[in-house]
Amino acid sequence: MKIIIKMTITFIFLLLPFYVYGQNYADMIIIEKSERVLKILKEGKVIKTYSIALGFEPIGHKQNQGDGKTPEGLYYINKKLFNSDFHIALQISYPNKWDIRKAQIRNISPGGSIMIHGQSNKINSTLDLDWTNGCIAVTNTEIEEISKFVRIQTPIYIKK
């Protein structure tokens, strides 16, 4: 009987950290471009908010490669990059099928490599102005924290 109790307690203590850690994942990320904020949501409630910088032409939906716009719409996190030119980067699933189709109709490239990332490792970048090529930038400390909240496939809604 004692061995069963010891095994049960050991089992609980071995699995508890994984259970607790898993409970901290975000359900969704919301980017409000006009407010320059990134919100982490869990069970429909905002649990954390961050100030952001956007693309150098932030108004409007990204249409083509090089336009400096940050896309708008529903996407998801499809990759975590821990060895990035921007400290840590979370790749966004832009372009989606609709973005690709719209670009094909106009015979242009929709662009790509849109990410939530930290500050540049090569140049001195700040969040005081919109400086990215269409990405969403936060501080290095913040991207470290954000990367712990999200998993691959976490939805991200980017709105005006």
Each model region followed by its residue ranges:
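Exported/periplasmic cell-wall-interacting domains
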Residues: L81-K160
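Hydrophobic alpha-helical transmembrane segments of integral membrane proteins
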Residues: F13-L14
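Sec-dependent signal peptide recognition
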Residues: K2-T10
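A structural motif detector for short, solvent-exposed N-terminal "entry" segments of globular domains
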Residues: G22-F56
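Well-ordered beta-strand positions in beta-sheet-rich domains
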Residues: M28, T49-S51, L74, S113, ...
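N-terminal post-signal-peptidase region of extra-cytosolic proteins
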Residues: Q23-D27, L54-N78, W98-K102, Q119, ...
